[in-house]
């Protein structure tokens, strides 16, 4: 917020409570210029040293999920995704401590659950996709109450830069719709879901309305449908009702090449050049295709009258040992930077080594996990060339 010096009455604005309109403008103001950061998807609660290390890369924000942490109940902060009954206070204290640590390191935080009532994260659900939230309205009601409680509890915390309602929602998944099918199919599917339990736009508007009753200031980040696919965002008929919303997509396409499964092939797919089914036809991926995929989100935002600084590449990445990972990361960043959006790489010092770009190519996965199990995490080499590439982009 600009310093006010001209008249005595203006100074009173600075004393307005956090949830005032004046402070709301200030909070969204963080996102008025491009911000670059990283994801924290750790099983152990990150401490100050972790956040300081992330800040040391040049990151200004962290997308922090808490759902993998050990909580009072089965599901951290939810208690139980089968029946939400309120925020467990031990979990609240643990999350607040992590937020304090991030704040002391100078990072802004976007908090994001992997699970919501009726939508337990598949990796904590025996590998099964939990579709209840998208088929039973009772769970949507619970999700609304959950976020109302979170907003009431954390609205005054200085570290929080946005509430990210849920990671990678996929109300489309069980309906037979192809994830990267024809754009006309995505649009038609969205039209068919209007006012139903799978209407993600309706769901988000409901949740945000509940948040605003408790917290008028904090921005909200929303992942697009079908695992935060920019094409699913482009199928939305309208922007959301609230003005302090950031629209997020994730970028791993072509997934067949960037994901762990590719590393198990005798000859891993290469980029550029890998061919996948996309938009109803075969596509040989090159930089222009990466750009076109990402541009779907920015073009939609422009059509909706939104600034490019309201669009976020909330995750992107590739397997660190894939020989084309550096080329891919650079192409993704170039595409987002060209449009002026925000980004956060996946991920920083996760317990999984697959996308830990600090690790050098010479460090084999087995060696990494052995060192972690032996309590030698401090001795793990962290001079990977991919992180040097990211640092250049973070500080550029």
Task: Give each language-model segment a name.
Residues 70-90, 119-137, 173-189, 356-364:
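Surface-exposed, active-site-proximal loop segments in enzymatic domains
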Residues 43, 50-59, 82-113, 124-165, ...:
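An active-site-proximal structural segment forming one wall of the substrate-binding cleft
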Residues 23-85, 300-301:
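N-terminal carbohydrate-binding accessory modules
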Residues 1-9:
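Bacterial N-terminal signal peptides that target proteins for export
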Residues 39-49, 69-72, 86-89, 170-172, ...:
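Acidic-and-aromatic substrate-binding clefts and catalytic sites of carbohydrate-active enzymes
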Residues 8-17:
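Bacterial N-terminal signal peptides
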Residues 323-396:
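Aromatic-rich peripheral "rim/lid" segments of glycoside hydrolase catalytic domains that contact
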Residues 123, 131-283, 295-319, 338-344:
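Active-site region of glycoside hydrolase catalytic domains
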